[in-house]
């Protein structure tokens, strides 16, 4: 398995999970002139699985170009994207407090899917894998949702929650990959790195 990658992600959770795997990394982040929000725009009628694969592939190609432009030594590039889906509805990262409240009200008492796509590039090779997990939220009172949103934890996270944080108090069950729900499925990532 490759033990060094360029990580094209700002997520501290992805860094933590790579460290857990024993994979060294160097961050390969977008510059302010790159329109990363454009990459994450949902197309009309786009299914969650199609969306997460498309966004991850676009992020990967942008990161490979970034590596080339910066003339960095060649090494595998890794990126990932996580989306939360309730039915065909995609819940991205909340833009504000109202978004976070709406997302969490929607998820309260429901079981939803968390899809995390991870992709790697090495030379001309491109590999992608998707982890799909189910997360069940217990019914939450509005006061509990507001208190959680007030912590600031929902921001920057798909679906407005982080399973590894305070939201865990409201999650009654998960089925699938805990690390996939966090943002980088370790098993799938290791399998991809073995193939390079």
Regions found by a protein language model. Give the residues of each.
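N-terminal polybasic phosphate/anion-binding patch
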Residues: 1-76, 89, 195-196
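GST superfamily/GST-like fold recognition
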Residues: 2-23, 100, 110, 132-196
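Mobile beta-alpha loop/short-helix "lid" or hinge segments that flank ligand
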Residues: 24-36, 116-125, 156-168
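Acidic/polar active-site rim loop that often engages polyanionic ligands
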Residues: 36-41, 86, 124-131
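Generic enzyme active-site microenvironment
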Residues: 79
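Active-site-adjacent loop/tail segments of enzyme domains
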Residues: 82-112
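Short beta-strand and adjoining strand-loop segment in the mid-core
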Residues: 88-92, 119, 130-138
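Anionic-ligand binding region
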Residues: 101-107, 116-133
């Amino acid at each position: 398995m490759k033990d060094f990658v360029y990580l094209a992600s700002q997520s501290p959770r992805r860094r933590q999970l790579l460290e857990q795997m024993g994979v060294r990394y160097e961050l390969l982040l977008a510059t302010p002139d790159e329109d990363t929000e454009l990459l994450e725009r949902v197309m009309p009628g786009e299914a969650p699985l199609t969306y997460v694969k498309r966004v991850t592939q676009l992020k990967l190609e942008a990161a490979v170009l970034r590596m080339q432009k910066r003339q960095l030594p060649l090494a595998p590039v890794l990126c990932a994207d996580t989306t939360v889906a309730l039915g065909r509805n995609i819940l991205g990262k909340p833009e504000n407090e109202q978004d976070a409240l709406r997302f969490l009200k929607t998820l309260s008492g429901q079981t939803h899917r968390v899809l995390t796509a991870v992709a790697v590039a090495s030379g001309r090779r491109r590999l992608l894998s998707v982890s799909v997990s189910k997360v069940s939220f217990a019914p939450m009172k509005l006061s509990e949702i507001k208190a959680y949103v007030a912590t600031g934890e929902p921001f920057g996270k798909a679906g407005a929650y982080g399973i590894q944080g305070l939201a865990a108090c409201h999650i009654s069950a998960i089925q699938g990959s805990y690390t996939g729900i966090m943002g980088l499925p370790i098993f799938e990532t290791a399998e991809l790195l073995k193939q390079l």
